[in-house]
């Protein structure tokens, strides 16, 4: 029977999650969905000083926005301390780990001496029990660390789904501390216990964890487990080619939401930031899950391109449902001081959205319908609202007031009739109408704008020219 696929996302809640971080959730989520497996969320919060519930909330909020649903969790490492201590005790009892009384000062001196001899600094196994080896009496009043008995000789070998075969000599690895003097377990140990207890089959994570992997594999095997498949993702670089980070100006995932990006656009962009399905650039969430595999993960660092993300967002805005876009855009309009009443927002969105790269830009374009009475520049009024144009404006207003139905087609026909009657070109009449009704010279098609403003508003504002 084939083992059920189980993947995990295991962030540290330190207050900030950017696109590079959330990609380490997206890929294991997609793989679990593709394989009809389970996706687990684990919060690695053992760094008590830097961890916070607010940061956990940001992680959950970011995942919810992208609809990365979880099957189990969130599990919190700080709530599993008793389990870690239990396994530490079992390992000491079984001879897989031992108490080490070497002080920090002694360890520093040892490493300094090794450096002076040109050797790699490492613990020398002084307190490691071996057959026939006599250990000194433990010093009084010293709380020991617990070290894992790393295998001597041989190598740790694994076939990384991204990097290929990796082989690390055990001689490069010293005996890892798995519990501190106060009994708290260390990061690498907690990860191993969690992955075993949660039956994780595939670990898809950033390649900054490659160096941890041989140590984790050795502990897993010592505990009788089978190591998962590892896929170490290359780094995501920012526009300057540096590792993406808050310090280097990366935006948080929720920041993209707040700037007016759509979750489907961010997910589509993220999916391509280190994985490819042929030349496909635009695809749905469902297509992504159907296509995703580990074989096509990129082997080189991916570089963030804001123009590409904006292009994708523009695509999803253009093809998006206008009712949904209206709901999402309204808060942005209100943040600009607009009051959404009068003109039908769904119709306004349909009119203005095609050139917008973000919902903020949609809101900016829509604002002319919702900012109250127009306040056109006096100089522009003087330039365009001339005595010569007044008769045409009066005729237009009268004809618009008499229309049997207020539609774009009827409004357009009325403009053409007035232009023909007075021998005018469209800009000569449209510009003053724009100023009077919208308060600005640049708008979408004038017939569409007037239709959305509504008959009463248009006639009232045109009357101001009289």
From Swiss-Prot:
Localization: Cytoplasm
Stored Pfam families: Anticodon_2 (PF19269), tRNA-synt_1c (PF00749)
Binding-site residues for ATP, renumbered to this chain: 246
Residue window of motif 'KMSKS' region: 243-247
Keywords, sorted A to Z: Aminoacyl-tRNA synthetase, ATP-binding, Cytoplasm, Ligase, Nucleotide-binding, Protein biosynthesis
The keyword ATP-binding appears for this protein: yes
GO CC term (a single one): cytosol
The EC number(s) this enzyme carries: 6.1.1.17
Keyword Electron transport found: no
CDD domains: GluRS_core
Complex formation: Monomer.
Family designation: Belongs to the class-I aminoacyl-tRNA synthetase family. Glutamate--tRNA ligase type 1 subfamily.
NCBIfam families: gltX_bact
Function, as annotated: Catalyzes the attachment of glutamate to tRNA(Glu) in a two-step reaction: glutamate is first activated by ATP to form Glu-AMP and then transferred to the acceptor end of tRNA(Glu).
Name of the protein in question: Glutamate--tRNA ligase
